[in-house]
């Protein structure tokens, strides 16, 4: 009987060790799950904060761009050109822009080509006076600005659309010297 009582004690101890070990493992799993959930909640909160900051900055940029259009004091710095058949190319905003400064406007397009072009940098520049400036806002908050530029010997019709929620805009240029309508995309910023 002493032997069976000792074996029973060993089994009880083993059962107690197994129960303790499984409880400890479950507690560690629970702690790991809690830490994982905390990290996920922190990441989600950080993403939400960054998204809210980005939306606020975009809204400020949009308001500044709208005011610049109303004041007729802006530059659309194009970083992408969309050709007639839909092909796109990235371009330099230093040489591809539309500027409106009161009654004067400059429309310059220049592509990275080995040919100098009429403006000496591989494209065309129309610099002159504006006429027929019209600014409208649609029901979604997109702002449209249309005007004509009359330069020396050449002119162009300019159609700008500023999308609501940021300062990203597109401009369509219809020059009088050819039928190659160009669409540029970039940021519209106030003229400093």
Label each residue range with its predicted role.
Residues 1-11:
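Single conserved hydrophobic/aromatic residue that forms the stacking wall/gate
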Residues 14-22:
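Bacterial N-terminal signal peptides
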Residues 25-68, 75:
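Sec-dependent signal peptide cleavage junction
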Residues 60-61, 78-94:
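N-terminal post-signal-peptidase region of extra-cytosolic proteins
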Residues 75-77, 97-99, 104-108, 146, ...:
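Soluble periplasmic/extracytoplasmic beta-strand elements of cell-envelope proteins
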Residues 79-81, 101-103, 110-112, 150, ...:
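Solvent-exposed coil/turn segments that connect beta secondary-structure elements
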Residues 88-140:
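Mid-length scaffold segments of soluble, non-membrane domains
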Residues 132-192:
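Helix-rich interaction surfaces within compact, conserved domain-sized segments
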């Amino acid at each position: 009987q002493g032997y069976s009582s000792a074996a029973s004690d060993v089994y009880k101890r083993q059962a107690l060790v197994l129960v303790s070990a499984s409880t400890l493992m479950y507690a560690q799993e629970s702690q790991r799950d809690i830490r994982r959930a905390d990290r996920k909640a922190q990441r989600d909160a950080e993403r939400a904060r960054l998204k809210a900051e980005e939306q606020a900055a975009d809204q400020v940029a949009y308001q500044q761009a709208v005011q610049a259009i109303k004041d007729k004091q802006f530059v659309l710095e194009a970083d992408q050109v969309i050709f007639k058949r839909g092909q796109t190319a990235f371009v330099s905003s230093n040489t591809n822009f539309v500027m409106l400064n009161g009654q004067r406007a400059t429309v310059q397009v220049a592509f990275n080509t080995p040919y100098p072009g009429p403006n000496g940098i591989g494209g065309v520049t129309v610099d002159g006076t504006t006429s027929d400036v019209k600014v409208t806002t649609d029901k979604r908050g997109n702002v449209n600005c249309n005007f004509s530029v009359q330069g020396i010997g050449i002119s162009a019709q300019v159609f700008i659309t500023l999308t609501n929620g940021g300062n990203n805009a597109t401009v369509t240029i219809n020059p009088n010297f050819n039928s190659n309508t160009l669409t540029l995309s970039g940021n519209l910023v106030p003229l400093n």
